[in-house]
Amino acid sequence: MENKATLARNIGEKRVSPRSKVNGTGKSWRISYSPQRMDGVSSGRNVSKIPSPVRERLFLKNQERKPLGVSPLSNLSPNSLGRNSLEKSTYNNKLSLKDFEVGRKLGKGKFGKVYCVRHKKSGFICALKAIEKNEILQFNLLKQLKREVDIQLGMDHPNIIKLYAHFHDEKRVYLLMEHSINGELYKSLKNNGPFNDVLASHYIYQIADALHYMHKKRIIHRDVKPENVLIGFDNVVKLADFGWSILNPEGSKRKTLCGTIDYLSPEMITPREYDEQVDVWALGVLAYELVVGVPPFEENSKELTYKRILKCDLNFPESISKDAKDLISKLLVTDTTQRLSLTGVKTHPWILKNKPFW
């Protein structure tokens, strides 16, 4: 397990982009990921048995996508996370780490690390997120983790990362998820972007459809951004990371300030009560970043970024198409009642014009 100094560095690690995450506790910078051997978590099997990235693609392309079984987090409590519980496991879970061959590291977030794993019995390849129980206790994450799991288990959509199962042992909680072979949209954007209208419109349509599905279930994502969109085969993208997602009963409003600075909506900054329209605004920011290469309101300081967001200070390069400008301008509207609906996004001329070329 990482010591406190290492953990502190990970939480505050800065990437090239000045974009920071707002969660009431400080900043969390974008972190670069690099594949490497799993540290701190071992399945007891030779990692050489995991397919190479090329073979991994073939396995994922052909494998049947079906759940491996679910073990409830209801057994998890602050008491069960205490140091005394680390002596011997007494949990009755359907899955354990021994059921998997652990391969390359896919990424590392503020809390937890994600690995490519292969289910020994079925050969099923997934992404496994391992979160230290000590960190869950230290940062009071149990309630948020349970909410994230409950929300993700209740969703079934082709553009939302599937949570197959979850289990825990003496030291860690594990989330077994769908593996998207081509990684973050953010990395693709920085390496290959900005994107042309055909590709950008394809991505925006899929995310709009995922958000439309979530909103019908009264779920707000609250952290839509390129880092939380994963790319699979054939440019199919999937919305991921539901750590800030919340169930929002009809007619109710939220007040919590959370998300990423460049993607915050005016109503969240003010601050005042907000609803699922914060996701619609974020979709507009995402559309802009995909076709321009940078967020529309990005500045060197949080204060300047906030000012531009509140003024909706939107500027387009001359290279951006008329239809793309129109869609983005109709999403990035200060008045929440005047923003284009997600249905309107999916039937917008920019989408319909490019759809035949997807």
UniProtKB/Swiss-Prot annotation:
Pfam family membership, one: Pkinase
Keyword line: ATP-binding, Cell cycle, Centromere, Chromosome, Chromosome partition, Cytoplasm, Cytoskeleton, Kinase, Kinetochore, Nucleotide-binding, Nucleus, Serine/threonine-protein kinase, Transferase
EC number of the protein: 2.7.11.1
Catalytic activity: L-seryl-[protein] + ATP = O-phospho-L-seryl-[protein] + ADP + H(+); L-threonyl-[protein] + ATP = O-phospho-L-threonyl-[protein] + ADP + H(+)
GO biological process: attachment of spindle microtubules to kinetochore; homologous chromosome segregation; meiotic sister chromatid segregation; meiotic spindle checkpoint signaling; mitotic DNA integrity checkpoint signaling; mitotic spindle disassembly; negative regulation of protein import into nucleus during spindle assembly checkpoint; regulation of cytokinesis
Gene Ontology CC: chromosome passenger complex; cytoplasm; kinetochore; kinetochore microtubule; nucleus; spindle midzone
Binding residues for ATP: 106-114, 129
Localization annotation: Nucleus; Cytoplasm, Cytoskeleton, Spindle; Chromosome, Centromere, Kinetochore
Stretch list, region Disordered: 1-49
InterPro entries in alphabetical order: Aur-like, Kinase-like_dom_sf, Prot_kinase_dom, Protein_kinase_ATP_BS, Ser/Thr_kinase_AS
Domain (Protein kinase) ranges: 100-358
Main location: nucleus
Biased composition (Polar residues): 20-35
Family assignment from sequence similarity: Belongs to the protein kinase superfamily. Ser/Thr protein kinase family. Aurora subfamily.
Record's function text: Component of the chromosomal passenger complex (CPC), a complex that acts as a key regulator of chromosome segregation and cytokinesis. Has a role in error-correction of aberrent kinetochore-microtubule attachments to ensure that sister kinetochores become bioriented and connect to opposite poles by promoting spindle assembly checkpoint signaling.
Protein name, UniProt field: Aurora kinase
Gene from which the chain derives: IPL1
